[in-house]
Amino acid sequence: MFVARKISPNCKPGVRGKHTLPKLPYDYAALEPIICREIMELHHQKHHQTYVNNLNAAEEQLEEAKSKSDTTKLIQLAPALRFNGGGHINHTIFWQNLSPNKTQPSDDLKKAIESQWKSLEEFKKELTTLTVAVQGSGWGWLGFNKKSGKLQLAALPNQDPLEASTGLIPLFGIDVWEHAYYLQYKNVRPSYVEAIWDIANWDDISCRFQEAKKLGC
């Protein structure tokens, strides 16, 4: 049901595998001093794992409700599927969007950014401002608009998944739930968002951009 799950090409139609917590492509301490080890462990092992567990539970209930043609239950499950499914999708992208290694946008992505925001720094400033301004918990996103063929920024509340909510293909997401930064940055969200650019994985973001363009009109 959700893109975060890897499905074997040999799987039979209708056979649902359980979602699992993805392994990080780096050590928990690898993103220090930008994000400390304690935050990474809690964020990955506790918060993301909870989304995975709750998504699996909701999907099991969904299958049962479908088998019983229980329309009321199907409707009741929609918020849990959106919240936990979104949490799983968003975090799976988030881990890959970060890297302890210094990277740069591909020439193609840099050109696209500069054509819309004049410079990479202006783009960073606009996404930072948008993300910091999220009320409560949520995410700031760089996405790709398949219809226009252009990059687009968006801010979404809670764990709302970008593509399901807006149609934009997610390229880079910034998590501004307090569990992502509070132990280290306290209530100074701007400092966290500004610092995260130092660990942005432009290799991953650039790759997502290339793949997204293939889906455009």
Swiss-Prot record:
It is found in: Mitochondrion matrix. One of its GO terms (biological process) is positive regulation of mitophagy. Homotetramer. GO terms for molecular function: antioxidant activity; manganese ion binding; superoxide dismutase activity. Its main location: mitochondrion. GO terms for cellular component: mitochondrial matrix; mitochondrion. The keyword Manganese applies. It catalyses: 2 superoxide + 2 H(+) = H2O2 + O2. Residues 1-17 form a transit peptide. Its EC number is 1.15.1.1. Pfam families: Sod_Fe_C, Sod_Fe_N. SUPFAM superfamilies: Fe,Mn superoxide dismutase (SOD), C-terminal domain, Fe,Mn superoxide dismutase (SOD), N-terminal domain. PROSITE patterns: SOD_MN. Destroys superoxide anion radicals which are normally produced within the cells and which are toxic to biological systems. Mn(2+) binds at residues 43, 91, 175, 179. Belongs to the iron/manganese superoxide dismutase family. This is Superoxide dismutase [Mn], mitochondrial. The gene is Sod2. The keyword Cell membrane does not apply. The lineage of its organism: Eukaryota, Metazoa, Ecdysozoa, Arthropoda, Hexapoda.
